[in-house]
C-alpha cells in the first residue's frame, strides 16, 4: 500500500540519521569528498546499505569512490559505464573492482547486464563478473534465455538477480520475475527495484515478504511522478519525499532479516546528485534507527 505521508515524520528520520552532519560536506566540490567520513548513530538491523553507481553515472570511478566513502556506505553495485561487464575484458573489470577494494569498499554486484539467448554473450558476462571476484550480478535475461542462465549459474556458482523495469518491461513487477524463475536454480533470484515495481502497481513491501527466499538485492528509490511506465523528469525524487512507503519497505527487509544489499539508485535529473543522495541515505538511516 502506498502512503503519500509517513507516520514517521521526515524531521524525526533526518534527525535520527544526523543528516546535517553528512549533507554539508557533500555540498563541497567533489575533490573535497575524500575527507574523513562522519560517524552516524542508530541501529541498522543488519541491513547493508550501499550505492548503485548508476546514480552517479556521469562521474568518474574516483569520484564515485569519494562519494561512497563520504556517505559511509560499504558496498557498491557498479554500472557498466564504470566497469564494462558486457563489453570489456576480465582484467579491465578486475582493475576497476580493485580500485574500490583498495578504499575499503566492496563491489557486490553490477548494474543491469543484458542476458539474451546467446551463449557467447552470456558467457562473457559470467567470465567478467566471476573473473573480477564477484559472486553476484544484476541481470536481465529473457524468458527464453533462463535455461542458458541456469547452466552458467551452475557452472560459475554465481548468483543472477533479475531486475524488474516497470509496466513496459518483460518483468513489469518483481513478482512476475519471481514466478518465472521458480522452476530454476535458486541462484537465479531477484533485484527488486521498488520504484519500477510501484509504477507497475506493485506493493514493494508485500513482494519483499512474498519472495523473501529469492531476493538478492534491492534498489531503493522514490518517486512522485505519474504511473506512466517510466520515470519522467518530474518522477524520481529524494528518498522519503515521494509516494512510496519507504518505512514499510525497510520494515519488510528487517522482518525477513535481509542479508544482502539495499542499494540507493537516485535518479532525479539534477546536475549534482550528491546532496540528494546524502538526504536519501540519511532518511533511510533515520528510519532504521527509529525502528
Regions found by a protein language model. Give the residues of each.
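C-terminal segment of N-terminal export signals and the immediately downstream linker at the start
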Residues: 28-59, 66-67
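Acidic/histidine-rich catalytic cores of soluble enzymes
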Residues: 75-76, 155-243, 247-250
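Active-site acidic/histidine proton-transfer and metal-coordination neighborhood
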Residues: 18, 23-26, 41, 63-65, ...
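N-terminal secretory signal peptides
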Residues: 1-8
Amino acid at each position: 500500500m502506498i502512503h503519500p505521508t509517513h507516520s514517521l515524520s521526515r524531521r524525526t528520520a533526518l534527525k535520527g540519521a544526523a543528516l546535517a552532519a553528512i549533507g554539508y560536506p557533500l555540498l563541497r566540490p567533489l575533490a573535497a569528498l575524500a575527507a574523513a567520513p562522519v560517524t552516524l548513530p542508530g541501529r541498522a538491523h543488519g541491513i547493508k546499505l550501499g550505492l548503485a553507481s548508476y546514480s552517479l553515472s556521469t562521474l568518474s570511478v574516483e569520484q564515485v569512490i569519494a562519494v561512497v566513502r563520504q556517505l559511509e556506505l560499504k558496498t557498491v553495485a557498479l554500472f557498466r559505464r564504470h566497469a564494462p561487464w558486457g563489453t570489456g575484458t576480465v582484467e579491465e573489470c578486475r582493475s576497476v573492482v580493485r580500485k574500490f577494494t583498495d578504499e575499503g569498499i566492496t563491489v557486490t554486484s553490477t548494474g543491469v547486464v543484458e542476458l539474451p539467448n546467446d551463449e557467447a554473450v552470456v558467457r562473457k558476462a559470467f567470465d567478467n563478473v566471476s573473473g573480477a571476484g564477484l559472486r553476484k550480478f544484476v541481470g536481465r535475461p529473457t524468458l527464453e534465455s533462463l535455461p542458458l542462465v541456469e547452466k552458467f549459474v551452475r557452472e560459475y556458482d554465481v548468483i543472477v538477480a533479475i531486475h524488474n523495469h516497470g509496466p513496459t518491461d518483460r518483468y513489469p513487477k518483481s513478482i512476475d520475475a519471481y514466478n518465472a524463475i521458480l522452476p530454476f536454480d535458486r541462484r537465479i533470484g531477484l533485484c527488486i527495484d521498488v520504484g519500477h515495481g510501484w509504477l507497475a502497481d506493485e506493493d514493494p513491501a508485500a513482494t519483499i515478504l512474498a519472495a523473501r527466499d529469492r531476493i538478492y538485492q534491492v534498489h531503493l528509490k522514490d518517486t512522485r511522478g505519474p504511473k506512466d511506465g517510466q520515470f519522467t523528469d518530474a518522477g524520481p525524487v529524494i528518498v522519503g519525499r515521494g509516494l512510496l512507503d519507504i518505512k514499510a519497505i525497510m520494515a519488510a527487509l528487517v522482518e525477513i532479516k535481509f542479508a544482502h544489499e539495499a542499494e540507493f539508485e537516485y535518479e532525479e535529473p539534477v546536475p549534482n546528485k550528491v546532496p540528494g543522495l546524502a538526504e536519501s541515505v540519511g532518511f533511510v538511516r533515520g528510519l532504521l534507527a527509529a525502528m
